[in-house]
């Protein structure tokens, strides 16, 4: 019998053991679809971004006009731009669901895979931030000014660091050029880190909803889960196409349709919706350095998850008390997202401070203590 080429060819062998003959737990739910959806988002963003970069001009006097030119004069340019802008929102929706699934089902106990995933989240946030500056609208300019200015809170080197990033004494042409460079290169770095993420995942195999060892009950990835992923692709691409054609500016900011003007400050400076929860945490601390540290820690706290997991059970499926607080964390993050989009006035300031405190309280105190409590109650 002739040996199957995909099992022996050096290149095909890697693809085969990653996407075809990969042993996969038979009971993984649709929650496990988000990893492949993130891969699709990355491919879509690189593809649309590459075509947009062909027509974009990274110059303060031409950037805004070049976006208008893409939308008006380039064949299907409006569609490329809308797919790219809304594709970023879908990217974040998928990554937040992916992280939520990891927290719910205890996937963070695969330490290397989890830690690389958190690094990917940082890279994605950086890419989205520098990308938001490129259209050079009012919110682009003032968002860049406010967020980069936060680095001045760093002791001793702060002001020098900000000027180094700006390439001058204010956000100007040099800033836009380097932000475009970063926005172009970061997706390729994300692709490389994603491959490392997959490499570590395939060392251990996927977890499953029960949190139990699934070695006794595995099936090949293809055709069972490849078709399941394909259904996810169809649903997500359909939703993205619908949003990009019927309501392309639904998630954007109207201020960004006004060219950047350093002399006029918008009434309310805010980032895109997917970074609002971090922005709310930033604003809830009255001290500048404290706010910056709180934002960084709000993501870095995810690195602690494998360390603070004290329960003998992996998944929240069999942990009713911890499950309640998991959903409280989700609700709390939704409240922070809402607060980040509101003006800085009461009662929003107070709500933001309470929600920020609860966010860290759930992670640092409640997760480890609930694990110990449930062990005691279950006598395990």
Swiss-Prot record:
<dbReference type="GO" id="GO:0006122">
    <property type="term" value="P:mitochondrial electron transport, ubiquinol to cytochrome c"/>
</dbReference>
<keyword id="KW-0472">Membrane</keyword>
<feature type="transmembrane region" description="Helical">
    <location>
        <begin position="114"/>
        <end position="134"/>
    </location>
</feature>
<keyword id="KW-0830">Ubiquinone</keyword>
<dbReference type="InterPro" id="IPR048260">
    <property type="entry name" value="Cytochrome_b_C_euk/bac"/>
</dbReference>
<feature type="transmembrane region" description="Helical">
    <location>
        <begin position="34"/>
        <end position="54"/>
    </location>
</feature>
<feature type="transmembrane region" description="Helical">
    <location>
        <begin position="179"/>
        <end position="199"/>
    </location>
</feature>
<feature type="transmembrane region" description="Helical">
    <location>
        <begin position="227"/>
        <end position="247"/>
    </location>
</feature>
<keyword id="KW-0349">Heme</keyword>
<keyword id="KW-0496">Mitochondrion</keyword>
<keyword id="KW-0999">Mitochondrion inner membrane</keyword>
<comment type="subunit">
    <text>The cytochrome bc1 complex contains 3 respiratory subunits (MT-CYB, CYC1 and UQCRFS1), 2 core proteins (UQCRC1 and UQCRC2) and probably 6 low-molecular weight proteins.</text>
</comment>
<dbReference type="InterPro" id="IPR027387">
    <property type="entry name" value="Cytb/b6-like_sf"/>
</dbReference>
<dbReference type="InterPro" id="IPR036150">
    <property type="entry name" value="Cyt_b/b6_C_sf"/>
</dbReference>
<comment type="similarity">
    <text>Belongs to the cytochrome b family.</text>
</comment>
<dbReference type="GO" id="GO:0046872">
    <property type="term" value="F:metal ion binding"/>
</dbReference>
<dbReference type="InterPro" id="IPR048259">
    <property type="entry name" value="Cytochrome_b_N_euk/bac"/>
</dbReference>
<feature type="binding site" description="axial binding residue">
    <location>
        <position position="98"/>
    </location>
    <ligand>
        <name>heme b b566</name>
    </ligand>
</feature>
<feature type="binding site" description="axial binding residue">
    <location>
        <position position="197"/>
    </location>
    <ligand>
        <name>heme b b566</name>
    </ligand>
</feature>
<dbReference type="InterPro" id="IPR030689">
    <property type="entry name" value="Cytochrome_b"/>
</dbReference>
<keyword id="KW-0249">Electron transport</keyword>
<protein>
    <recommendedName>
        <fullName>Cytochrome b</fullName>
    </recommendedName>
</protein>
<dbReference type="InterPro" id="IPR005797">
    <property type="entry name" value="Cyt_b/b6_N"/>
</dbReference>
<dbReference type="InterPro" id="IPR016174">
    <property type="entry name" value="Di-haem_cyt_TM"/>
</dbReference>
<keyword id="KW-0813">Transport</keyword>
<feature type="transmembrane region" description="Helical">
    <location>
        <begin position="348"/>
        <end position="368"/>
    </location>
</feature>
<feature type="binding site" description="axial binding residue">
    <location>
        <position position="183"/>
    </location>
    <ligand>
        <name>heme b b562</name>
    </ligand>
</feature>
<dbReference type="GO" id="GO:0008121">
    <property type="term" value="F:ubiquinol-cytochrome-c reductase activity"/>
</dbReference>
<dbReference type="GO" id="GO:0005743">
    <property type="term" value="C:mitochondrial inner membrane"/>
</dbReference>
<feature type="transmembrane region" description="Helical">
    <location>
        <begin position="78"/>
        <end position="99"/>
    </location>
</feature>
<dbReference type="Pfam" id="PF00033">
    <property type="entry name" value="Cytochrome_B"/>
</dbReference>
<comment type="function">
    <text>Component of the ubiquinol-cytochrome c reductase complex (complex III or cytochrome b-c1 complex) that is part of the mitochondrial respiratory chain. The b-c1 complex mediates electron transfer from ubiquinol to cytochrome c. Contributes to the generation of a proton gradient across the mitochondrial membrane that is then used for ATP synthesis.</text>
</comment>
<dbReference type="Pfam" id="PF00032">
    <property type="entry name" value="Cytochrom_B_C"/>
</dbReference>
<feature type="transmembrane region" description="Helical">
    <location>
        <begin position="321"/>
        <end position="341"/>
    </location>
</feature>
<keyword id="KW-0408">Iron</keyword>
<feature type="binding site">
    <location>
        <position position="202"/>
    </location>
    <ligand>
        <name>a ubiquinone</name>
    </ligand>
</feature>
<keyword id="KW-0679">Respiratory chain</keyword>
<feature type="transmembrane region" description="Helical">
    <location>
        <begin position="289"/>
        <end position="309"/>
    </location>
</feature>
<feature type="binding site" description="axial binding residue">
    <location>
        <position position="84"/>
    </location>
    <ligand>
        <name>heme b b562</name>
    </ligand>
</feature>
<keyword id="KW-1133">Transmembrane helix</keyword>
<dbReference type="GO" id="GO:0045275">
    <property type="term" value="C:respiratory chain complex III"/>
</dbReference>
<keyword id="KW-0812">Transmembrane</keyword>
